[in-house]
Amino acid sequence: MRVLRIIAAALVFSALPFLSTPPAQADTSRIKDIASLQAGRDNQLIGYGLVVGLQGTGDSLRSSPFTEQSMRAMLQNLGITTQGGQSNAKNIAAVMVTANLPPFASPGSRVDVTVSSLGDATSLRGGNLIMTSLSGADGQIYAVAQGALIVNGFSAQGDAATLTQGVTTSARVPNGAIIERELPSKFKDSVNLVLQLRNPDFSTAVRVADVVNAFARARYGDPIAEPRDSQEIAVQKPRVADLTRLMAEIENLTVETDTPAKVVINERTGTIVIGADVRISRVAVSYGTLTVQVTESPQVIQPAPFSRGQTAVQPQTDIMAMQEGSKVAIVEGPDLRTLVAGLNSIGLKADGIIAILQGIKSAGALQAELVLQ
């Protein structure tokens, strides 16, 4: 039986005079929470390794020949001769190992790593990652990873059923990689620094520059910051300032942040996130639900006894359609609280609200950017 649910929404847009609403209370954040130093970005590392100690949930070596090749190469590097036929071990798996190398990381510090199955292993639970070198985009080795895996999901299997929850072919090793090489950094020798906003916005960029300049005038007598665009703010180091101390003082300054109004919709999960500055002009929404139920009831037709006929299957389909009465509702949202209350009053589920928001955007009444994921 299949059930098809169709949400119909008809929108009528009506222009209204400008509604004067009190401005929302401004949010203040530290600069370190909304911006990062351009010279202090992360770098991605990647490596290929083996996970051992699995309880029969590893790669089947016939389907994943690269796993057996890697296992033999590892044993040979350890001085163990591997000759003979093909191995039937199921407690080993080939994996890709990834990590982020944080800025200013020094040799000896540790970072987390993510391990993902490369072959046909069904679960990495209980496994251990064997020493794996992690390289950067330049091909140089910057870290070495090893350790016990932590898997969030689980899988149980019997003769006639299998139960899986979460992802069992991906795992993490907290603090599993040791930094072996330091990235070259010119931070100490820099004269100009660049702050990059994590959420680009012209208003926020100007406010960051103003706050930094107000601090610099009081401390050094001259402004030192200049906004370049919606994302970058250039900061010039005063001659008498220590760069590390200057950045420590700047990143703790508070700024009034501002972001564009957005509505983010994830149609797969039915998640709707509405920003605080989203506004909806008055619209009339007519909505109704049409449910189509399709039922398949195949019938088996047996031949007559002692005849040469064959058993046949005759398909039989029953279709039933049900439609609820359509209603007309007025939706208007001069602020977030009123908007959410208006959408909840309609009484629709998430998929219905998503369809209505898309229609309101098409009608030009949604004063925000609609982001579909």
From Swiss-Prot:
Q: Which organism is it from?
A: Agrobacterium fabrum (strain C58 / ATCC 33970)
Q: Which InterPro entries match?
A: Flag_FlgI (IPR001782)
Tell me a GO cellular component: bacterial-type flagellum basal body, distal rod, P ring
Q: Which Pfam families match?
A: FlgI
Query: Which residues, if any, are the signal sequence?
Result: 1-26
Example GO biological process term?
bacterial-type flagellum-dependent cell motility
Q: Would I find Isomerase among this entry's keywords? A: no
General function of this protein: Assembles around the rod to form the L-ring and probably protects the motor/basal body from shearing forces during rotation.
Subunit structure comment from the entry: The basal body constitutes a major portion of the flagellar organelle and consists of four rings (L,P,S, and M) mounted on a central rod.
The record's GO molecular-function terms, alphabetically, read: structural molecule activity
Keywords, A to Z, come to: Bacterial flagellum, Periplasm, Signal
What's this protein's name?
Flagellar P-ring protein
Q: Where in the cell is it found?
A: Periplasm; Bacterial flagellum basal body
Query: What protein family is recorded?
Result: Belongs to the FlgI family.
Its main localization is periplasm
User: Where are the annotated coiled coils located?
Assistant: none
